[in-house]
Each structure stands twice: as C-alpha cells, then as structure tokens.
Amino acid sequence: MNGQNIRIRLKAFDHRILDSSTREIVNTAKRTGAQVRGPIPLPTRIEKFTVNRSPHVDKKSREQFEMRTHKRLLDIVDPTPQTVDALMKLDLAAGVDVEIKL
C-alpha cells in the first residue's frame, strides 16, 4: 500500500472513552509497523438546550442542558496489510463513532 494514508476520525460524548480508543488504535498501528500521526484533538462541539423549568408559568425560570461531542483525528502513514487487518479486527468501546477514509 505505497503512498496511501488512512485517516481515522473518532467521535464520542465521553472524552475518557475516546482517549482510550485512540490509544488502542495507535498501539495497534505501531505494533504492525505503520507510522502514526496524531491523535490530533479537533474542536469540541457543544450543543445547548434551554427549557422552561415549570410546565405552566415562570417564563424567567429556565434550565440549560448541554451535549459535548469530542473528536480526535489520526493519520496512519504507509500502512502495511497487517495494519489494515489488525485495525479491522480491533474491538472498540461502545459509544465511539469511527469514520475511516483511505
């Protein structure tokens, strides 16, 4: 696989699970002889929701909730066939969204 890169983009709501999954991918890629660039932390997306505390009155009394989506980017440079096989067999934690681009 000469001259080809694998770009892996990870997303999760919990940054600890995201970091552990990133560590697993980096260790697997390095073990099979590929060069890894990253993990690069991408901007965290914060979605805020504002709702009334009471169902009927008190418009001024509100509560805010937020949902944070943490993201990481990995580049695997010149992957070997063993690297691709090892990454396909890798079992990551639930709650981590993985996008792979060749």
Swiss-Prot record:
SMART domains for this protein: Ribosomal_S10 (SM01403)
InterPro entries for the chain = Ribosomal_uS10, Ribosomal_uS10_CS, Ribosomal_uS10_dom, Ribosomal_uS10_dom_sf
SUPFAM superfamilies with a match to the protein in the record: Ribosomal protein S10
Query: Keywords, A to Z?
Result: Ribonucleoprotein, Ribosomal protein
Q: Give any GO molecular function from the UniProt entry.
A: structural constituent of ribosome
Q: Which Pfam families match?
A: Ribosomal_S10
| NCBIfam families, sorted | PRK00596.1, rpsJ_bact
What function does this protein fulfil?
A: Involved in the binding of tRNA to the ribosomes.
**Name of this protein:** Small ribosomal subunit protein uS10
- Organism of this sequence: Rhodopseudomonas palustris (strain BisB18)
Q: What is the lineage of its organism?
A: Bacteria, Pseudomonadati, Pseudomonadota, Alphaproteobacteria, Hyphomicrobiales
Gene name tied to this protein: rpsJ
